[in-house]
Amino acid sequence: MNKLAQLDHKYVWHPFTQMRDWLKREPIVIAEGKGAELRDVRGRKFLDANSSIWTNLHGHNHPKINSAIQRQLKKIAHSSALGLANEPASLLAEKLATVANGKLKKVFFSDDGSTALEAALKLACEFSRRTTKIKNPKFISLEGAYHGDTVGAVSLGHIDLFHKAYGGLLFKTDKVMSPYCYRCPFNRAKPERDDARNYRKCNWECVGKVEQKISVQKKKGNPYAAFVFEPLMQGAAGMIPQPKGWLNRVAKIARGCGALLIADEVMTGFGRTGKLFACHHENVQPDFLCVAKGMTGGYLPIAATLTTQKIFDAFLGEYHEFKTFFHGHSYTGNQLGAAASNAS
């Protein structure tokens, strides 16, 4: 076993990994990458088939992104966004607001997908309190949802393998049926058959379940503060696609019942579904758009939560009113990450 592998075994604790098994074998130690190819310290080549967990868009060692980071590094690597602005982050915010289309004109930067979702969750919660006077706003997300690993994001998740162990830390959220055409529960589709919608006329029973759940909550006088979803494709649940038309229908239902829309495009954003954002396929305009992963082309950790002027305005006020959004991170709006994102 080479020296680097020995150091890894001795000191490193890997994510989502049963370390008992990990320590039984020599790990693959990556030394460099080019395009879709990774090379380890022994010179062996590997295909980066999952794009380094859905982060890499243009290939490793892309000259344009390399140059952008190098140019920025000669100026400054990082300065705080707390009380200071910077050029790359300002330019990136403008680009994001432009390509997102619609009313998403305000950008809150953070570090990764979980923190982007966390910011949206806090903003939606406080916005709901201020506009409805409901003290404990409720949230709803889809069965099989995965939105990250911080406490708020885990509270919105519904995959027991990842989330059950932390039950005592979490706040309660509701879940609702997500569509699964391949194994549609309403027509007893057999696993070996094709998409259920191809051989039986669909009556959108899955949409009816969403409508029932959300409308019942509204009738209780405590409508959901927000409906949180992964648009078009649920990732960690098993790469489960949503049928055409489902997202548009449930978005209208949720909005009609007073819920804000939080679109988690951490995985689907930046062209993964054929359009820049998955919501664009169904003309869905969320109140919050959470992006990360591919934003830098897979280079550096930076994320963003896009929202509307209406949400932004709810946090404006005098200091004694305590309307400030008290949330942030040390590396919010980091110049190197923003420079990589602008190039990407």
Give a label for each model feature.
Residues M1-S344:
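Conserved N-terminal phosphate-binding loop of PLP-dependent enzymes in the Aspartate aminotransferase
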